[in-house]
Amino acid sequence: MSAFSVIVLILIGLAAGTLGGLVGVGGGIIMVPAMVYFLNSSQLQAQGTSLVVMMMPVGALGVYNYYTKGNLGNTDFKNAFIIALGFVFGSLIGSKLANSTLPILVIKKSFAVLMILVAIKMLFGK
């Protein structure tokens, strides 16, 4: 791996981690397009890499910082648990679809449309 690739990967991680900790966005919104665009990763490779990256650091360090600052009381643990249950099964279903039945172009375009819809909602929503 080239030094340039290592630097780009570190910058992608810094951007995704900073935004994840700052505003709670999923790191995949940053990491996936950055890996595809800057490192010529395939869509599936970028998605898989993003999932591995987010397994521990995002949750553990984010919760730790909220806890140490006394803001964990703002967390709705019941909702978090219910979402986590759906997330586990959704992740399993999504990864199976991505790795078996859906054409890569459909996945790539769907991801782009999702990002556009999220951006529009954030720009013009309440």
State what each model feature region is.
Residues M1-A16, Y37-F38, Q43-Q45, Y67-K126:
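Juxtamembrane transmembrane-helix boundary motif
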Residues Q47-L51:
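Small-residue hotspots at the loop-to-helix junctions and early N-terminal turns
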Residues L22-A34:
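Transmembrane helix boundary and interhelical junction motifs in multipass membrane proteins
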Residues V52-A60, F89:
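Membrane-embedded alpha-helical segments of transport systems
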